[in-house]
Amino acid sequence: MNFRYSIDATNKFKKDIKRIKKRGYDMALLKNVINKLAMGEPLPAANKDHALAGNMTGYRECHIQPDWLLLYIIDDDCLVLTLTRTGTHSDLF
């Protein structure tokens, strides 16, 4: 697999992953979305990928499942995909 972006994960994202695993979420779904993002491929419309506004300007959000989100930043200058948070709407907002 050739990734266009290197992948970086924040410490908060790593903690979120532990919580999501305990809840029994299908980690393969998350991995699939992360791989598509890292390869620079567009996500399917079902993932509802969009930019955030306000104090979250610069971040993007997509849905892994209806109430499971991934927050991330893509830096095209450095070719880095930074995974910032994952969880439910109530976990993140």
Each predicted region: which residue ranges?
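Basic, Lys/Arg-enriched alpha-helical interface segments
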Residues: 1-66, 75-81, 86, 90-93
